[in-house]
Regions:
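Carbohydrate-associated surface elements
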Residues: 146, 166
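A short helix/loop element that forms part of the nucleotide-sugar donor recognition site in Leloir-type
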Residues: 173-186
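Aromatic "clamp/platform" in nucleotide-sugar-dependent glycosyltransferases that forms part
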Residues: 286
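Nucleotide-activated donor-binding/catalytic signature segment of Leloir-type glycosyltransferases, i.e.
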Residues: 237-273
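A charged, aromatic-enriched C-terminal amphipathic alpha-helix characteristic of glycosyltransferases
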Residues: 343, 347, 357-389
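Short hydrophobic beta-strand element within catalytic cores of glycosyltransferases
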Residues: 294, 303-306, 321-324
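Conserved donor-binding/catalytic core segment of Leloir-type glycosyltransferases
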Residues: 9, 187-203, 209-212, 227-228
Length: 394
């Protein structure tokens, strides 16, 4: 008699090219070999995923403003009655599902579902109300020890497991830079500073372009020193084209496509070319629970310049050029109140110039970054196995 296949209800961005969506794609590709998968796809508006067979995908939003499908979650939970319910989202969204989990457990005391929250903690000062809101989960898992510590400081008393993100090194890998640039119509002698991030307040793209403009002006750098931004020119952040024109660097700007959106990006193969076109990756993010584009860039051998805060120093293990931040907090908006950190402008300019003027330093850091990201701990298959071991042990 064949063993009964357990059911998993997976709740997260799927199948979309967001950061959460990348994580979902990689985890689901392994989970589906072991579970009967039911997926509530956030930012998904079809009836099923046409690319990955054997999955039952429900759009999260019912068109009623509930974009995370919290109400639909409760309905599908009662319908599917999974063995494992895996939720990938921020802790304050996890709290919303947590209320439904509590209700489900009260109504169904005989249910054996294990509820798991895999959550990014990208900053200090996690509100106690958020921590209390995730108490109905049976397992809480963070990406880093930084995240684990912040939840504990917020008052979480239960056990917290730590499982990192991964990177698909069969896709994100070094290529010949000159050939890539020829294919992308980028000058082979250009010096490219790359930023891949969503155009949203936490990423501080206003500072990215300002610091770049200060750097090229202070050092009177030639026109072939350019900044490459991959992301939406207009989203929930700034009007990028107006800002770069104000700064006078519009002629130095490279973009992937003027019509990109948060849910419509490039293929992974095209993204690998984007990373390989760069001389250095630079982000001004004010808080980070992981930073998938950073990991992807590093796996192609591109050195990274990063602000020295939150989870970044931990998982990169020093394999980056770190820039100090200002010694004052900047609280996140929408009442979240997590502490964001602002990168030091003068120190960032110095770091950009150091990497520009030192080709050997770039090569060495790029080599070390590649070695770090190709370690087994960042392999998605190994990461999925770690999760399933946690599910098994209860």
């Amino acid at each position: 008699m064949s063993r009964k296949v357990q059911k998993m209800l997976y709740v997260g961005d799927f199948p979309v090219p967001t950061g959460f969506g990348v994580v979902s794609k990689n985890l689901v590709s392994h989970f589906k070999k072991h579970y009967d998968m039911h997926i509530i796809g956030i930012n998904y508006y079809g009836d099923y995923d046409p690319e990955i067979e054997g999955l039952k995908v429900y759009p999260a939003s019912a068109g009623n403003g509930d974009v995370f499908g919290v109400d639909k979650f409760f309905q599908i939970l009662q319908q599917v009655r999974p063995d494992v319910c895996f939720i990938l989202n921020d802790v304050w969204i996890g709290m919303e599902y947590g209320a439904k989990i509590k209700e489900f457990k009260t109504d169904n005391p005989e249910a054996k579902t294990m509820f798991v929250l895999y959550t990014p903690i990208d900053a200090e000062n996690i509100k106690p109300m958020f921590v209390e809101g995730i108490s109905p989960y049976d397992k809480v898992i963070t990406y880093t020890n930084f995240g684990k510590t912040q939840l504990e400081l917020g008052g979480y008393k239960g056990k917290i497991d730590v499982v990192p993100h991964g990177v698909d090194t069969s896709v994100f890998k070094p290529m010949d830079k000159k050939e890539v640039r020829k294919a992308m119509n980028i000058g082979v002698d250009d010096y490219i500073v790359l930023n891949v991030s969503r155009n949203q307040p936490r990423k501080k793209l206003d500072l990215f372009f300002f610091i770049f403009s200060e750097w090229v002006k202070r050092y009177n750098l030639p026109p072939n020193v350019r900044c490459y931004y991959h992301g939406a020119l207009r989203d929930v952040g700034i009007d990028i084209m107006q800002w770069v024109e104000y700064l006078g660097i519009q002629d130095r700007l490279v973009i992937s496509n003027p019509n990109l959106t948060a849910n419509r990006g490039l293929s992974e193969q095209s993204m690998n070319m984007v990373y390989n076109s760069a001389d250095v990756f630079f982000t001004t993010t004010a808080a980070e629970g992981w930073g998938l584009p950073i990991a992807e860039a590093m796996s192609t051998g591109v050195p990274a310049i990063l602000p020295n805060h939150s989870a970044l120093p931990e998982w990169t293990a020093g394999n980056a050029q770190f820039v100090p931040v200002y010694p004052f907090p900047s609280l996140a908006d929408r009442g979240l109140n997590t502490i964001h950190h602002i990168i030091n402008v003068d120190e960032a300019v110095k770091s950009l110039q150091f990497m520009y003027a030192n080709e050997e330093a770039r090569k060495n850091l790029g080599r070390d970054s590649y070695k770090h990201m190709t370690r087994g701990e960042f392999n998605w298959k190994n990461i999925a196995s770690r999760f399933m071991e946690i599910f098994k042990n209860g």
